[in-house]
Amino acid sequence: MENTYKIQKIGKVNAENGIYSIQLDKQFIPGLTNISGFKYLQVVWWGHLYDTPQNRASLIIDKPYKKCPDKLGVFGTRSEIRPNPILITTIQVMQIDMEAGKIYTPYIDAETGTDILDIKPYHMLERIKDCDVPDWCQHWPKWYEEAGDFDWADEFNF
């Protein structure tokens, strides 16, 4: 028996002229009550640009990163190509316009118009002190704050 789920969007991504924001739909704006004080949020979004039957059936990806093995299972990647294109990004909060329901961030790796499914606060307790990763990605930044200066273009094969 197949389970189905009803998911509704709560807002959309805006990325215009180098300004990134999340605009909540009006009925979800009260969900921002007392969220100020969190410097980082986790944003759950739908990878609509890759939501095809073929991509949903892809479980093995051919060398998405230059230094990874020739084949990599989709669950070992953060690729949009996956059985359910549900993606998560941690964003830095620059400003929250509570009245408008708008969250400003320096960057989010989602396109304008991307549906937002959920927003959660990023808590310090989610950090992992002893985090191990495969050798092929050991050289990646260890901290979010270092990732902006990293040459990601030299890592990807797409």
Feature roles, as predicted:
Residues 1-88, 95-158:
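Cys-His-centered catalytic/binding microenvironment captured across papain-like cysteine peptidases
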